[in-house]
């Protein structure tokens, strides 16, 4: 057991060491700069890569529902690329404009493609994956559902986190008559896993999470969609405990933001309140003092890892910190205009609250 604990500590130190590295060329650090060896995803779609004429890198793929997506990256030397339409096309299916800089960056134990705007602010991430369906299921499990929730009557439902490598550990407690934890799978719409959990007995439940809380209702498939008006099992249950598969590596409610670059597909799984707290938790890790007697300050004062030290921690933020803050802000802004679509998809709630 001591050996396992020692290895865990070493791994954590290694991860933070990698995240603290400055912008040296990726090839010099790892030698793994061949984009064609990986499949890349924003959490909604995935792309394989092949080499075109003149060294152009062609990204081709799509969602689980439809294909035919394509764009290209033009190598600019080192870990720099330029975003452009694929040959014969005028559109780009990812967030970005022709000419945007794209860089291959190391964060934690992985490498990511990051798109930057004209002011060099990052706003889009492509992560390396192996299987899009499994990635979407893992994102739903760990970012949309994971946690313990209780309503005013005291009923509690717990969704347990599960690594992508062990989907058999994906369990929920509180939906069966005996109250035991049981495995679940996801229902699908348009060939894509969605926020419907299916238990071993075949019963299905639609799970909707907003800033008002978690609501679970029975559901059945009607034509091509899951019924959204079934019997309510629990309504507006409040999260009483955060659960994460990364809890053992980093303290906090959102350790994912300290260990990896987050994609839009992952960030859209969180409620607006979660996004706000996640963003502020990044600052809190670096010792930021928040508004005295404010909600944010009181929240972090309850955490034993929080040590407020400065009113400005901008010089303490790592490249990964800055990236995830920028990505969270981008999704918060997008939520202001995408609310009707996101409500239809059952993914999000209200617009972000003002700054702390």
Q: Where on the chain are the PLM-derived regions?
A:
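Pro/Ala/Gly-rich low-complexity, hydrophilic intrinsically disordered segments
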Residues: 116-146, 219-222, 226-253, 343
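Sec/Tat-exported extracytoplasmic proteins
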Residues: 44, 149, 153, 163, ...
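Bacterial N-terminal signal peptides
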Residues: 10-20
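Bacterial N-terminal signal peptides that target proteins for export
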Residues: 1-11
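Tryptophan-anchored aromatic micro-motifs
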Residues: 26-54, 60, 126-156
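Sec-dependent signal peptide cleavage junction
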Residues: 22-37, 135-143, 243-258, 340, ...
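Amphipathic alpha-helical packing elements
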Residues: 267-307
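Contiguous, well-ordered beta-strand patches that form the walls/edges
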Residues: 46-51, 60-109, 155-160, 164-228
């Amino acid at each position: 057991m001591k050996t396992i604990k020692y290895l865990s500590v070493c791994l954590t130190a290694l991860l933070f060491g990698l995240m603290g590295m400055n912008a040296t060329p990726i090839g010099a650090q790892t030698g793994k700069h061949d984009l064609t060896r990986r499949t890349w995803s924003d959490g909604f779609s995935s792309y394989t890569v092949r080499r075109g004429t003149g060294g152009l890198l062609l990204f081709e793929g799509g969602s689980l529902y439809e294909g035919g997506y394509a764009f290209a990256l033009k190598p600019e030397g080192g870990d720099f690329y330029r975003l452009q339409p694929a040959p014969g096309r005028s559109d780009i299916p990812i967030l970005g404009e022709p000419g945007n800089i794209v860089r291959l960056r190391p964060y934690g134990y992985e490498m990511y493609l990051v798109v930057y705007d004209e002011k060099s602010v990052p706003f889009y991430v492509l992560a390396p994956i192996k299987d899009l369906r499994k990635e979407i299921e893992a994102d739903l499990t760990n970012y949309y559902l994971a946690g313990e929730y209780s309503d005013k009557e005291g009923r509690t439902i717990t969704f347990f986190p599960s690594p992508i490598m062990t989907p058999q550990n994906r369990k929920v407690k509180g939906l069966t008559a005996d109250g035991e934890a049981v495995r679940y799978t996801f229902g699908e719409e348009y060939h894509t896993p969605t926020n419907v959990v299916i238990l071993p007995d075949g019963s299905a439940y639609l799970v909707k999470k907003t800033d008002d809380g978690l609501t679970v209702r029975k559901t059945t498939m009607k034509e091509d969609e899951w019924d959204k008006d079934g019997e309510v099992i629990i309504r507006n249950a409040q999260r009483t405990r955060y659960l994460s598969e990364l809890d053992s590596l980093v303290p906090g409610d959102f350790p994912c933001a300290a260990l990896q670059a987050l994609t839009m597909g992952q960030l859209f799984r969180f409620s607006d309140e979660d996004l706000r707290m996640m963003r502020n938790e990044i600052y809190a890790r670096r010792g930021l003092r928040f508004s005295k007697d404010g909600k944010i300050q009181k929240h972090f004062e309850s955490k034993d890892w929080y040590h407020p030290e400065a009113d400005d921690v901008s010089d303490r933020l790592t490249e990964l910190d800055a990236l995830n803050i920028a990505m969270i802000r981008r999704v918060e802004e997008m939520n202001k205009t995408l609310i009707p679509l996101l409500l239809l998809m059952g993914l999000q709630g209200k617009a972000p609250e003002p700054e702390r």
